[in-house]
Amino acid sequence: MGKTVVCPGSFDPLTIGHLDIITRSSKLFDKVIVVVMRNYSKNVGSFTTEERVDFIKRCTKDLPNVYVDTHAGLLAEYVKEKGAHAVVKGLRAVSDFDDEFRQALTNQQLNPDMETIFMVSNSEHMFLSS
């Protein structure tokens, strides 16, 4: 059985930094699911969910083990539903770690089998934010 990971985010818009994390994940894991998370409590962004999915699919078309999906519920439930082993999150700076750490702890309580893997952003992409 291969290792499946989830790369979650709003991806509004998808940045070169996001694409770098997705590409690097695709080299480390058998299957990478990029999931565009829909957060109805946030204001509508620059692009619709469908536009973001289409853009990610076009940008990852040469990565055969990358799949794109959407989800409007809890990430921990999605990971369990997909049979994934972990979530991969990119960190640009130490300031990102605090929020991501708290989210990881919450997800771990909701799904004890779920791991969170932090990947440090490539230095040339550290200042990009969606």
PLM ranges: what are they?
Residues M1-S130:
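Nucleotidyltransferase catalytic core that binds NTPs
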